[in-house]
Amino acid sequence: MTADLPVVAVRAMANSVLRHLDKAAADLSAPGPEALSLSVWDLHMACEKVMKAYLNQQGIPYEQTHNLRDLVATSPKTHDWSAVKTVLGHFPSEQRVMKWRYQEGGVPSLNDLWRFYDVALEVCSIYAARMSRRFLLDNFSVQIRRPPWLESD
């Protein structure tokens, strides 16, 4: 992630978001209910980590919670979070995710799981896009030349 995150632990947390999404996709395509149940946990963790990284970058304290809806409520009012709130309406609560993680209460359907994956991508995309970034180019040079068809003989 290219976000400007000076705290090493927060940067490490943010850098693991893609790994959670990758693992969820692999689990969604793996056979067996165990993998399917764990995929929801990874999707939840991807959302939670990107939200917490954003809040940390903004200097906003947050409670140690797995509740994504509470984290959205903690997000600054300088942005419109209605899209996140809407898509999270299609995502299971943290209690439900925990039950699935521990193989309790059955397994979500494949249709539900892919919908959860879409929700996680949307949430991660919105939060990541709102993070500030800083790019540093050391020892960088550019040489601009006229194209050959514009050079005079």
What does each model-identified segment do?
Residues 1-39, 141-148:
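Charged alpha-helical initiation segments
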Residues 17, 39-40, 93, 113:
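Hydrophobic packing residues in well-ordered alpha-helices of helical domains and bundles
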Residues 21, 28, 50, 124-131:
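A structural signal for well-ordered alpha-helices, especially hydrophobic packing surfaces
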Residues 1-10, 55-153:
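Long, charged low-complexity segments
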Residues 39-57:
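Hydrophobic alpha-helical packing segments in soluble, helical-rich domains
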Residues 15-18, 22, 44-45, 118-121, ...:
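Generic structural signal for well-ordered, non-transmembrane alpha-helical segments
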